[in-house]
Amino acid sequence: METVIKLTGINKIYRTDEVETQALENVNLEVRKGEFLSIMGPSGCGKSTLLNIMGLLDEPTSGEIELCGTRIDPKLSDNRLAELRNKTLGFVFQSFHLIPTLNVLDNVQLPLIYRGVRSSERIRLAKEVIERVGLSHRMKHRPTQLSGGQCQRVAIARAIIGNPEILLADEPTGNLDSKMGAEIMELLHRLNREDGRTIVMVTHNEQQAAQTDRIIKFLDGRQIM
């Protein structure tokens, strides 16, 4: 099966004047197209750092990244990296990262604004994905008028509006109660199943991880299984 993310010999070291911390050590990982992968481990083990490197939000100290068959040149400009992220990747975070002054429809459109998509097309696509996550009746509401689960649905709609190959989710149910968390997981599984969309999820929840295709575990920056 096609590999959409390939990490080879990834190391990440954070340095200050007096301290050197190795966040990731010699990580080698392949993620297959259409796979739903969970990354687990204790706090501070490097999970989110790994996800940020996969998402081109952070650079490894050493090692190589391939995304959808393209080797990522460490010398790429910030603008080019942003373009790759916008076209290839969707992001879902624990804290939603919605703009509080914008309503649901406007929040969801943001990735297409960055792409320069015309307004009528943006609105059409935004309404489609908002309906898909079950929030058509909340389209004009602002984030402060929504529940946590509804805010995460908006964030997922925003993440998929550009039809990215890969969805990266960092503790997507971490701020939700068990009922809302289960609903978000069902939505993610549906996107994976119906679209064949690759999903990489960082989670502390063993029950949720057990429902995914594969689990990898980290400890002290090293992959242990």
Kindly give the residue locations of the regions a language model identified:
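Conserved switch/coupling elements of ABC/ABC-like ATPase nucleotide-binding domains
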Residues: D220-M225
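ABC family nucleotide-binding domain
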Residues: E2-L219
